[in-house]
């Protein structure tokens, strides 16, 4: 009976990792679409959001079956309940990739390289946070999430820089208001992705230690 449970739990871990890989790719694709005003790529992200939702449904169904059909001990219950919480944040990360893609469809111009470099760092850092959190969940190695809060602070710091840059350009009358709002919204969505990644790390910590501490 236990071997069957462990087999199903491994499948759950595999699906979580696959979902994480998918949304990581979508984030990068959305940011690159923003850089080059790539309408084809942006539309692909928007049209294929159901892929992320399907993973959420699959993982939720597997987790609930584990709860109902098996006899999980307390540590198993923490793992399963944490997975259910994590996929909610992961699905929202996928939604934010779509949000960025939707902005790309109407953005009036290609962004400046300096601003893009800050935005790509925000995206890369958020993806690193997500992947480290999922790896920690699968392996049980809590040390992998030790630096998550520091990474989130880095994302927040770059958001502040992007905002200051945009405000400066508005005052200098070098960009229009509509474009400024688009850039700020993209940066804000990436900041939220970082926040969701930090939430995931908190549920990972709970799954391992039994303590849910907000960072």
Question: What are the functions of these language-model segments?
Answer:
Residues 1-215:
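Cytosolic, long alpha-helical scaffolding segments
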């Amino acid at each position: 009976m236990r071997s069957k449970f462990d087999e199903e739990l491994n499948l759950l871990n595999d699906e979580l990792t696959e979902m994480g890989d998918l949304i990581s790719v979508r984030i990068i694709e959305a940011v690159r679409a923003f850089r080059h005003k790539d309408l084809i790529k942006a539309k692909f992200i928007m049209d294929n959001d159901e892929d992320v939702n399907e993973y959420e449904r699959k993982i939720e169904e597997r987790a609930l079956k584990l709860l109902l059909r098996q006899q999980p001990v307390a540590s198993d219950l923490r793992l399963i309940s944490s997975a259910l919480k994590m996929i909610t944040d992961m699905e929202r990360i996928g939604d934010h990739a779509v949000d960025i893609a939707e902005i790309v469809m109407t953005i009036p111009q290609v962004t400046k390289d300096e601003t893009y470099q800050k935005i790509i760092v925000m995206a890369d850092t958020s993806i690193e946070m997500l992947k480290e959190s999922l790896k920690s969940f699968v392996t049980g190695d809590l040390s992998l999430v030790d630096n998550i809060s520091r990474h989130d602070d880095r994302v927040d710091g770059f958001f502040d820089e992007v905002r200051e840059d945009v405000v400066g350009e508005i005052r200098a009358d070098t960009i229009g208001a509509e474009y400024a709002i688009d850039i700020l919204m993209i940066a804000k969505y990436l900041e939220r992705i970082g926040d969701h990644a930090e939430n995931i790390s908190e549920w990972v910590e709970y799954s391992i230690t039994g303590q849910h501490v907000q960072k």
